[in-house]
């Protein structure tokens, strides 16, 4: 005789790991060249002056300076730029 009842299976118990997306450096904050500004899927935020785009659409600073967000154009697209520190 079995000493334990059958365990049975469950259809739950798994979830994907969070991807830690979002804005990493906010408007007005200082950033060094190469620093990540936004991690995103697709181009929710577009690259402005002195901002590069990675192959996974990550936005990063090309120069040392301060981050500046703006809404541009008739489609009201959000854009991020890096302005040199004065």
Curated annotation (Swiss-Prot):
One of its GO terms (cellular component) is cytosolic large ribosomal subunit. Signal peptide: none annotated. Keywords: Ribonucleoprotein, Ribosomal protein. One of its GO terms (molecular function) is structural constituent of ribosome. Residues 1-21 are annotated as: Disordered. SUPFAM superfamilies: Ribosomal L27 protein-like. InterPro entries: Ribosomal_bL27 (IPR001684), Ribosomal_bL27_CS (IPR018261). Transmembrane segments: none annotated. Residues 1-10 have a biased composition (Gly residues). Pfam families: Ribosomal_L27. GO terms for biological process: translation. PANTHER family: LARGE RIBOSOMAL SUBUNIT PROTEIN BL27M, RIBOSOMAL PROTEIN L27. Belongs to the bacterial ribosomal protein bL27 family. NCBIfam families: L27 (TIGR00062). This is Large ribosomal subunit protein bL27. The lineage of its organism: Bacteria, Pseudomonadati, Pseudomonadota, Betaproteobacteria, Burkholderiales. The gene is rpmA.
């Amino acid at each position: 005789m079995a000493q334990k009842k059958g365990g049975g299976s469950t259809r739950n118990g798994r979830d994907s790991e969070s991807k830690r997306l979002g804005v990493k450096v906010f408007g007005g904050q200082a950033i060094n060249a190469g620093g990540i500004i936004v991690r995103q899927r697709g181009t929710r935020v577009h690259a402005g002056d002195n901002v590069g785009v990675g192959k996974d659409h990550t936005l990063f600073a090309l120069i040392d300076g301060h981050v500046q967000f703006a809404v541009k154009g008739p489609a009201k697209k959000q854009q991020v730029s890096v302005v040199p520190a004065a």
